[in-house]
């Protein structure tokens, strides 16, 4: 079992990492989110979160980011390793309830795991 923290090594930090995901990765959609996914050379899954100003003011954008981080933190063990994932919030995410956001994230990660099967047995 891994620790439930969201360490620096688990995050996408550099601009070129985000760009690389969308130039050479694949995308999956859910009702409130879009995700770019690309295989990495690390031994861990890494997450990036993008919420543009078009989605809402800072407090609303931060709330969405907190929900994404928390979902990732709790469900990281169920996801395949060696992937970079950038989750982008759609405008619909602002008005969604926490339950809707969680359902949408579950759908997104389910689609991504179907698209990219786990290396683990």
Curated annotation (Swiss-Prot):
The keyword RNA-binding applies. It holds the Pfam family Ribonuclease_P. SUPFAM superfamilies: Ribosomal protein S5 domain 2-like. GO terms for cellular component: ribonuclease P complex. Its EC number is 3.1.26.5. InterPro entries: Ribosomal_Su5_D2-typ_SF, Ribsml_uS5_D2-typ_fold_subgr, RNase_P, RNase_P_CS. It is an enzyme of class 3 (hydrolase). HAMAP family: RNase_P. Belongs to the RnpA family. RNaseP catalyzes the removal of the 5'-leader sequence from pre-tRNA to produce the mature 5'-terminus. It can also cleave other RNA substrates such as 4.5S RNA. The protein component plays an auxiliary but essential role in vivo by binding to the 5'-leader sequence and broadening the substrate specificity of the ribozyme. NCBIfam families: rnpA. Consists of a catalytic RNA component (M1 or rnpB) and a protein subunit. This is Ribonuclease P protein component. It comes from Desulfosudis oleivorans (strain DSM 6200 / JCM 39069 / Hxd3).
């Amino acid at each position: 079992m891994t620790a439930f923290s969201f360490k620096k090594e688990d995050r996408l930090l550099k601009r070129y990492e985000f760009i690389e995901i969308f130039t050479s990765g694949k995308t999956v959609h859910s009702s409130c989110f879009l995700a770019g996914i690309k295989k990495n050379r690390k031994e861990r899954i890494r997450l990036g979160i993008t919420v543009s100003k078009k989605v809402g003011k800072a407090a609303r954008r931060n709330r969405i980011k907190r929900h994404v981080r928390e979902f990732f933190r709790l469900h990281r063990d169920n996801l395949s390793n060696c992937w970079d994932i950038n989750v982008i919030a759609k405008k619909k995410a602002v008005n969604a309830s926490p339950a809707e956001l969680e359902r949408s994230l579950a759908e997104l990660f389910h689609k991504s795991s179907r698209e990219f099967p786990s290396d683990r047995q």
